[in-house]
Amino acid sequence: MIQPQTLLNVADNSGARELMCIRIIGASNRRYAHIGDVIVAVIKEAVPNMPLARSEVVRAVIVRTCKELKRDNGMIIRYDDNAAVVIDQEGNPKGTRVFGAIARELRQLNFTKIVSLAPEVL
């Protein structure tokens, strides 16, 4: 469960290393975001000499959360960290690689480009 002020790792090579959630896209009074939700975040830590710099406001899609994800078949998936992938306005990733495992639910949410770049889909 991601809420405003939550720090997230970045799971791509866009140049950002750490994000802080500042808003959840969707309903105006949503409190938490889960896997597949789009958030507005600020870059707290970035790699030098890359297109994305510190204190930039970006959109990101959440790909991993520490909170369990319950599937319809009874399976429960939990990750070790909270992570997101930086995206543009059309929903395409800004980086060219995605690191770590990605949940299968992103495919149903039309983030197929992120799923195709991921090394492992759970």
Curated annotation (Swiss-Prot):
Checking Gene3D superfamilies in the record gives:
Ribosomal protein L14
Q: Which GO cellular component term is one of those annotated?
A: cytosolic large ribosomal subunit
- Name the InterPro entries on file: Ribosomal_uL14, Ribosomal_uL14_bac-type, Ribosomal_uL14_CS, Ribosomal_uL14_sf
Alphabetized UniProt keyword annotations:
Chloroplast, Plastid, Ribonucleoprotein, Ribosomal protein, RNA-binding, rRNA-binding
Q: What is this protein called?
A: Large ribosomal subunit protein uL14c
Q: Which organism is it from?
A: Panax ginseng (Korean ginseng)
Heme recorded as keyword: no
Q: Where in the cell is it found?
A: Plastid, Chloroplast
NCBIfam families named among the record's database cross-references: rplN_bact
CDD domains this protein is in? Ribosomal_uL14
Free-text function comment from the UniProt entry: Binds to 23S rRNA.
- Any one GO MF annotation of this record: large ribosomal subunit rRNA binding
- Binding partners and assembly: Part of the 50S ribosomal subunit.
Which positions, given as ranges, span the membrane? none
Q: One of this protein's Pfam families, by short name?
A: Ribosomal_L14
The protein's matches in HAMAP family, at most eight in alphabetical order, are given as:
Ribosomal_uL14
Q: Which family does it belong to?
A: Belongs to the universal ribosomal protein uL14 family.
| Main localization (coarse) | plastid
Q: Name one GO biological process term.
A: translation
Q: Does the keyword GTP-binding apply?
A: no
